[in-house]
Amino acid sequence: MADNFNFELVSPERLLLSEQVIDVVIPASEGEMTVMAHHAPTMTTIKPGVVKVHSASGKKQDYVVFGGFADILPTGCTLLAESAIPVEDLNQDELTRRINAAKAELEDAEHHEHKSRLEHFIMELTHLSGSIQKD
């Protein structure tokens, strides 16, 4: 049986989740990363994507995050999201609004680095939109 560890998902608005979990899959900037108890200490950036939580009670929950940071320790993981919402609460119109806002910002961007970051962000949001569309 796998050991449990504490996982916290925090957005600027509120603490979305704080509980004992078996594992968490996070959309790290380097790729999807599964975090379990006794994980090596790691700090990573989070790209827009889905966080998959497998709680110690057996319940599985998915959250959409729009970037942030994860602080991973052997005893726990804290994900500080720029914005986060349970997948079932995600409105496709809201995701489309975020994509359009990023495109508008891209049109006004003057520096190459800023344009590059926005293009990457738009690509990630578009991929996210396609991967979570509801039937």
Swiss-Prot record:
Keyword annotations from UniProtKB, A to Z: ATP synthesis, Cell inner membrane, Cell membrane, CF(1), Hydrogen ion transport, Ion transport, Membrane, Transport
Location in or out of the cell: Cell inner membrane
CDD domains: F1-ATPase_delta
InterPro entries assigned: ATP_synth_F1_dsu/esu, ATP_synth_F1_dsu/esu_N, ATPsynth_dsu/esu_N
Record-linked SUPFAM superfamilies: Epsilon subunit of F1F0-ATP synthase N-terminal domain
PANTHER family: ATP SYNTHASE DELTA/EPSILON CHAIN, ATP SYNTHASE EPSILON CHAIN, CHLOROPLASTIC
Its biological purpose: Produces ATP from ADP in the presence of a proton gradient across the membrane.
Protein name per the record: ATP synthase epsilon chain
Organism: Rhizobium rhizogenes (strain K84 / ATCC BAA-868) (Agrobacterium radiobacter)
Gene assigned in the entry: atpC
